[in-house]
Design a protein with these regions (language model features):
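Surface segments flanking catalytic/ligand-binding clefts of nucleic-acid enzymes
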Residues: 96-248
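Short gly/ser-rich loop at a beta-strand->alpha-helix junction or flexible surface loop bordering the NTP-binding
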Residues: 1-125, 246-248
Length: 248
């Protein structure tokens, strides 16, 4: 790519509606990137950047040039924490549910994210991006699920399975957010939508299915994720311990 001006960094982060926390993402100003063969964009309300770009790192949305999802993930690495970069990576790697979404393929593969890192080895924040890719997993449906998984693993708990179907009694299949099938422990993160009346009924039925099949269902909310998810870790750890798991 030789001549262009494209929305990038925090602006592209918002355009792509990425999950995760990017410091300053809502600050005034539009981030514009150009190839390093051009002068940096300098005008009121514009935050200019220059860099090396490959043809497949720029796309067009409603007539506006914007850095691709994978390139945007890398460009934001300098300001984001490793865990929040992992949140975005999980989002990009997630396999969609065709019955509920307008796509059938993930936004990126692990190989595509790795290739992006290999292309731009001197990019600020690339070390954090590499660590984020190492701890990214396919299967998380939301940012809280990723943060919960990371907190559990960091606390020394076994790594859970992500959104894997569990066959319960009478052939009923449930797909918990996180699971320890070996110990018959399921973990669900319940966001604000779980307070709605219809969802409460579904949640009760779900819990009955798990308990009837001998599983423990651990229900986690935003409150449990405070203070580095200590309460969430304690709940899951207690459930695993009751099934014979012991920390190393």
């Amino acid at each position: 790519v030789t001549q262009f001006s494209a929305a990038s960094h925090a602006t592209a982060f918002l355009i792509w509606d990425f999950p995760g926390f990017l410091p300053g993402s809502h600050s005034p100003g539009i981030h514009i990137s150009r190839p390093d063969t051009m002068a940096i964009a300098r005008r009121r309300g514009v935050i200019g950047h220059v860099g090396q770009f490959f043809d497949d790192e720029i796309t067009r949305i409603d007539g506006v040039l914007v850095t691709t999802r994978t390139r945007t993930w890398l460009d934001c690495a300098r300001k984001m924490s490793i865990d929040e970069l992992t949140v975005v990576a999980d989002h990009l790697l997630r396999h969609p549910r065709p019955a509920f979404e307008s796509r059938t393929e993930p936004y990126a593969s692990p190989a595509q994210l790795a290739e992006m890192l290999d292309r731009h080895k001197g990019t600020p924040g690339i070390r954090k991006a590499r660590l984020a890719l190492e701890q990214a997993r396919i299967g998380a449906d939301s940012a809280p699920e990723t943060r919960l998984r990371l907190a559990l693993c960091r606390a020394g708990l076994p790594e859970p399975e992500l959104n894997v179907g569990a066959v319960l009694r009478n052939g009923v299949v449930r797909q918990p957010d996180l699971a320890y099938s070996e110990h018959q422990v399921a973990v669900e993160y319940e966001g604000a939508g779980h307070s709605e009346a219809a969802q409460v009924i579904r949640d009760i039925a779900r819990e009955e299915d798990f308990s009837g099949a001998g599983w423990i269902l651990v229900r986690i909310s935003k409150r449990h994720m405070e203070n580095d998810a200590r309460a969430a870790v304690a709940k899951v750890s207690a459930a695993l311990a009751s099934r014979g798991w012991q920390p190393n």
